[in-house]
């Protein structure tokens, strides 16, 4: 009886531990999580140096978020194998971009991970369009025409320990084309269209239609050819096919 009670207590303790850990993982439908992801992306997109003339305001896409969640749940510290296949990842986009962050759940916030990607700006030379170190996360983050995003978090103890989390963001249309700048250098918003408004140095279209609600949208892209890697995050790089 004592042994049975002991196992019952251990089972309850284990259940509590799982529940405690799971409660820290935000849902892809959590408005607070969504706002944090969008705000951090747009804050850094609006602060690029040199300034961007055509940087678009980024908005949330449910389909990209579902894609990010499905891949995060795989707990693989590598890129989704659908990224180099036309319309394979998500029907709304021919190709999708991807950034991945890995770290402890206690230190995780969307802003923390996204800022880590942005900090790669120090390794990017805008004039030569080259990186002195890994900077693919930065260039995807500030790719002017990648203005749909969906992100997700999952616990992945197999990747480092019980508190290890993986954070995945997917972008549409995909960015990171070789020998192309992520945006047009110039006065902020100077290349916004007539339909767009300048919001915090970003070109924002009022009442923008989200791709997964628009079955007629046919965005285009190029086949991805290269993957960037560092110990803490991954950035998906694309090479333009000539």
Swiss-Prot record:
<keyword id="KW-0325">Glycoprotein</keyword>
<dbReference type="GO" id="GO:0001669">
    <property type="term" value="C:acrosomal vesicle"/>
</dbReference>
<keyword id="KW-0968">Cytoplasmic vesicle</keyword>
<feature type="domain" description="SCP">
    <location>
        <begin position="39"/>
        <end position="171"/>
    </location>
</feature>
<comment type="similarity">
    <text>Belongs to the CRISP family.</text>
</comment>
<keyword id="KW-0278">Fertilization</keyword>
<dbReference type="GO" id="GO:0005886">
    <property type="term" value="C:plasma membrane"/>
</dbReference>
<comment type="function">
    <text>Required for optimal fertilization at the stage of sperm-oocyte fusion, plays a role in optimizing acrosome function, the translocation of IZUMO1 during the acrosome reaction and the fertilization process. Component of epididymosomes, one type of membranous microvesicules which mediate the transfer of lipids and proteins to spermatozoa plasma membrane during epididymal maturation. Also component of the CD9-positive microvesicules found in the cauda region.</text>
</comment>
<dbReference type="InterPro" id="IPR002413">
    <property type="entry name" value="V5_allergen-like"/>
</dbReference>
<dbReference type="GO" id="GO:0098635">
    <property type="term" value="C:protein complex involved in cell-cell adhesion"/>
</dbReference>
<keyword id="KW-0472">Membrane</keyword>
<dbReference type="GO" id="GO:0045121">
    <property type="term" value="C:membrane raft"/>
</dbReference>
<feature type="glycosylation site" description="N-linked (GlcNAc...) asparagine">
    <location>
        <position position="119"/>
    </location>
</feature>
<keyword id="KW-0732">Signal</keyword>
<dbReference type="GO" id="GO:0005615">
    <property type="term" value="C:extracellular space"/>
</dbReference>
<dbReference type="InterPro" id="IPR001283">
    <property type="entry name" value="CRISP-related"/>
</dbReference>
<keyword id="KW-0449">Lipoprotein</keyword>
<dbReference type="InterPro" id="IPR014044">
    <property type="entry name" value="CAP_dom"/>
</dbReference>
<protein>
    <recommendedName>
        <fullName>GLIPR1-like protein 1</fullName>
    </recommendedName>
</protein>
<dbReference type="InterPro" id="IPR018244">
    <property type="entry name" value="Allrgn_V5/Tpx1_CS"/>
</dbReference>
<feature type="lipid moiety-binding region" description="GPI-anchor amidated glycine">
    <location>
        <position position="221"/>
    </location>
</feature>
<feature type="propeptide" description="Removed in mature form">
    <location>
        <begin position="222"/>
        <end position="242"/>
    </location>
</feature>
<dbReference type="Pfam" id="PF00188">
    <property type="entry name" value="CAP"/>
</dbReference>
<keyword id="KW-0336">GPI-anchor</keyword>
<feature type="signal peptide">
    <location>
        <begin position="1"/>
        <end position="22"/>
    </location>
</feature>
<keyword id="KW-0964">Secreted</keyword>
<dbReference type="GO" id="GO:0098552">
    <property type="term" value="C:side of membrane"/>
</dbReference>
<dbReference type="GO" id="GO:0007342">
    <property type="term" value="P:fusion of sperm to egg plasma membrane involved in single fertilization"/>
</dbReference>
<keyword id="KW-1003">Cell membrane</keyword>
<dbReference type="InterPro" id="IPR034121">
    <property type="entry name" value="SCP_GLIPR-1-like"/>
</dbReference>
<dbReference type="GO" id="GO:0019953">
    <property type="term" value="P:sexual reproduction"/>
</dbReference>
<comment type="subunit">
    <text>Part of a oolemmal binding multimeric complex (IZUMO1 complex) composed at least of IZUMO1 and GLIPR1L1; the complex assemblage is influenced by the maturation status of the male germ cell. Interacts with IZUMO1.</text>
</comment>
<dbReference type="InterPro" id="IPR035940">
    <property type="entry name" value="CAP_sf"/>
</dbReference>
